[in-house]
Structures are given as C-alpha cells and as structure tokens.
C-alpha cells in the first residue's frame, strides 16, 4: 500500500514538540497534576482511589470509585455537567477489578502535561456537586 507520508511527518513533528518540552519536564508536570488530583479526591468522603501509595510509581492515570454510584453514572454526570471526559467500566481488566473489589469497574481520569490545575479543580468540584 501507499505509505502514510502525512502520518510520518506528523509523528516527526510530535516527537520534536515533546523533545522541545523535555520528557523529564513532562514527567514532573504529570506527577504534580496526578498528586493534586489524588489529594483532592482523598478529601471527598465516599471516593475510593486505586493508585500506588508511592508517587514515584504513579502515572497520569487515576482510577477511582464513588460509593453508591456506578462508574458509568459518574462518567455521564461529569460529561453532562462540566464537559469532562473520563473512562468508566472494566478497562479490559475484569479479573483484576473483581479481585480488588470493583465488580462494576472504576472511573479513570487521564492527565497529561497540558492539563491545568483548573481542569482538576473542575473535576473535583463536579464530583462534590454530584454528591450533594
């Protein structure tokens, strides 16, 4: 078939973009955002977080549940109320999630270096509003 020249050029530009920012800078930023989200979610009664306790072993993906609500309900509320997109369900890890006591799955927020503190604050505020 025809090679994807546009795809190759796009990949090259993406690599250049990341190199300019610096992978270490991206790692530091994502860790800061991840820690902020976890700290704020921990402060909400009924929210259970599934993440390594040591921040050095975390990545920018945080899984959590909200007591008394299905993950899909939480994801739909976040989308409807604040245009926040998260993943909900079993995340292709049914056996693991059942083993850790999440038979309905979890909500998974994915953070990237381009997210802002405001993005996290909006997500947390929306969850708080949902629980009122």
Where are these regions (language model features)?
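Pyridoxal 5′-phosphate
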Residues: 1-132
């Amino acid at each position: 078939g025809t090679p994807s020249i546009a795809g190759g050029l796009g990949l090259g530009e993406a690599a250049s973009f990341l190199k300019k920012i610096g992978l270490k800078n991206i790692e530091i930023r994502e860790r800061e955002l991840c820690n902020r989200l976890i700290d704020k979610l921990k402060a909400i009664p009924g929210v259970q977080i599934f993440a390594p306790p040591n921040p050095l072993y975390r990545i920018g993906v945080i899984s959590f549940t909200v007591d008394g609500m299905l993950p899909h309900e939480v994801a739909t509320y976040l989308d409807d109320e604040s245009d926040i997109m998260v993943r909900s369900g079993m995340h292709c890890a049914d056996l693991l999630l059942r083993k850790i006591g999440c038979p309905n799955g979890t909500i998974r927020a994915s953070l990237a270096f381009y997210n802002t503190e405001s993005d996290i604050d909006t997500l947390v505020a929306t969850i708080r509003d949902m629980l009122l």
